[in-house]
Amino acid sequence: MPWSSLFQPVERLNAEAGLEDWYARLLARLGGTPQPFELALLGGLQAATPGLAFLAGYQAALRVLWPAAPWTAGALCVTENRSTRPADMNTRIEGQQISGRKDFVTAAECADWLLVAAREEGEGQMPRLALGVVRQGAPGVRIEPLPALPLIPDIGHARLHLQQAQGERLAGDGWDAYVKPFRTLEDTHVLTAVSAWLFGIGRESGWPDALLLRLQALLAGCAEVARQAPNAPATHLLLAGLFSEQQALAGELDAALAAGPACWAELWQRDKGLLRIAEAARAKRLEKARHIVAGF
């Protein structure tokens, strides 16, 4: 990881030409095929908004999940009727065809490929997931944009409609190998990207050295957690520590931003809640991890 890049002058990328264009320009700046953590770190650093930093972290997590993914933007499609439980899903994969609906797909507008969680068990069997890949624009694939949310409104969401769409089934169990670990991969890489965005703003705005040093330490911790197995109990414990460190900086961050350009403070006040979206789920994983490592 070229850490020296963190301390170089930053030219931020905006998304005036759309998210797909933004992501392509980011990859070009990073040499075309960056490692996932580098994509999250330097993508966050160069992002013009917290939402774009989120997008860099999200794409980085997807690349860890599916290392053979094309070098275009993608999305993971799981949620149906506000649930991610396999038993609540109706989307199915039969052979190489996928049919169903996903209700909340992040960054669908710029996604070239879509990873779709779909049930594949036989009649009378327990729900079992597979993960299939479909391409946006292919026959049977339709994206329905949803209204922008108050949080990171520059990153869109959509419903995905599939009608006998041609798909490639990825190897492994859809839940254990993909959906379950992605939660931790996303948390780690989004925290990295957003912290890098803050660090870049702080260097530009002349924040106190002590605050910048703590952000550096947080990023170094993210690098270590990114190397760990996402389903390991110790990983959940370490990741919880990183989020605790980030939350402990909240007052200092708000004060530093308030003392600088109003544009950065306004963006952060609007979007800082993105780091708390999955807070309840992380707390459950932390409690479970504590019991496992304690031998309960």
Where are these regions (language model features)?
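Glycine-rich flavin
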Residues: 2-110
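Residue-level signal for inorganic ion chemistry
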Residues: 62, 132, 198
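Active-site glycine-rich loop that binds ribose-phosphate moieties when present
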Residues: 99-100, 138-149
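DPxDG-like acidic metal-binding loop motif
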Residues: 99-137
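Glycine-rich beta->alpha junctions and the first turn(s) of the following alpha-helix
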Residues: 147-225
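Short amphipathic alpha-helical coiled-coil/interface segments
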Residues: 219, 239-250
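Glycine-rich phosphate/cofactor-binding loops in nucleotide/flavin-utilizing enzymes
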Residues: 258-296
